[in-house]
Amino acid sequence: MEIKLEQLGYCYQKNSPFEKRALLDVNVSFDSGSYSAIIGHTGSGKSTLLQHLNALLMPTEGKITVGEREIVAGVKQKKLRDLRKKVGIVFQFPEAQLFEETVEKDICFGPMNFGVSEEDAKLRAKKVIYEVGLTEEILSRSPFELSGGQMRRVAIAGVLAMDPEVLVLDEPTAGLDPHGREEIMEMFYNLHKEKGLTTVLVTHSMEDAARYAEKIVLMKAGTVLQIGSPREIFAKPDALVDLGLSVPDVVRFQGLFERKFNVKLTKTCLTIAELITEMAPYLAKGGA
């Protein structure tokens, strides 16, 4: 499912003394089945943009098109439930939203709230619990008896049980250890490929943006500063650092190598394998 934002703008508490501009003239599209990342410093508008993707927030200017559904600023919208079924959002610390007495009931809550029968919802719960790396026996347990990592997977299963066509991820690995982060990100990537999901990741991790995204949207102060491939975005690491962002370790090491040997490699490397290949001629000569 394609998503397109055209001249999108948003103000909190518009036309009040407390009006605050959050987004201005945002133009970006997310192709059906693509994996995109949105990056930017805290306060750049990433999460505000994200909440427009399933109409949790409505634009104050411009429009957003999600599949066949068009949302135009100032036009009253009906039947937003249909849109919200198709666009699933995993927020930071989603386990904080768990509340039912069993894992199964928690996973079933969303689908049943959107009109899915209890029988069908239970079948979905059995399916998605495996998709998030857990087993069926956990369905009868209280979510509050589980580890933090298991609780997060259960919360994610609740989003997947809605059978979305678009998956929006807002810092989905916040608070996890490195191993847990990698497991969760690999899980999302596998789901993206297997289900053909349109995936949009909001992240502070440049490593994840470089590793998984096909396209990166760089934001600053509510505007889109640049749109490009990971290689294009990370080709100017100093500009990202000036914005208060980090760069992937491979990119940082490439910069150190180029300065040390006074050379310029033929491309911005995103993996260790690429970097080794690029450095090999200079290392063989003992430097340039």
From Swiss-Prot:
Primary location: membrane
Identification of the protein by name: Energy-coupling factor transporter ATP-binding protein EcfA2
Organism encoding this protein: Listeria welshimeri serovar 6b (strain ATCC 35897 / DSM 20650 / CCUG 15529 / CIP 8149 / NCTC 11857 / SLCC 5334 / V8)
Taxonomic lineage of the native organism: Bacteria, Bacillati, Bacillota, Bacilli, Bacillales
NCBIfam families from the UniProt entry: ECF_ATPase_2, PRK13634.1
One function term, GO molecular function aspect: ATP hydrolysis activity
Entry keywords, A to Z: ATP-binding, Cell membrane, Membrane, Nucleotide-binding, Translocase, Transport
EC annotation from Swiss-Prot or TrEMBL: 7.-.-.-
Protein family according to the UniProt entry: Belongs to the ABC transporter superfamily. Energy-coupling factor EcfA family.
SMART domains, per the entry: AAA
Subcellular location: Cell membrane
Role, per record: ATP-binding (A) component of a common energy-coupling factor (ECF) ABC-transporter complex. Unlike classic ABC transporters this ECF transporter provides the energy necessary to transport a number of different substrates.
Residue ranges of every copy of the ABC transporter domain listed in the record: 3-246
List of residues binding ATP: G40, H41, T42, G43, S44, G45, K46, S47
Gene encoding the protein: ecfA2
Record text on subunit structure and interactions: Forms a stable energy-coupling factor (ECF) transporter complex composed of 2 membrane-embedded substrate-binding proteins (S component), 2 ATP-binding proteins (A component) and 2 transmembrane proteins (T component).
Membrane topology: Peripheral membrane protein
Pfam families: ABC_tran
GO (cellular component) term, any one: ATP-binding cassette (ABC) transporter complex
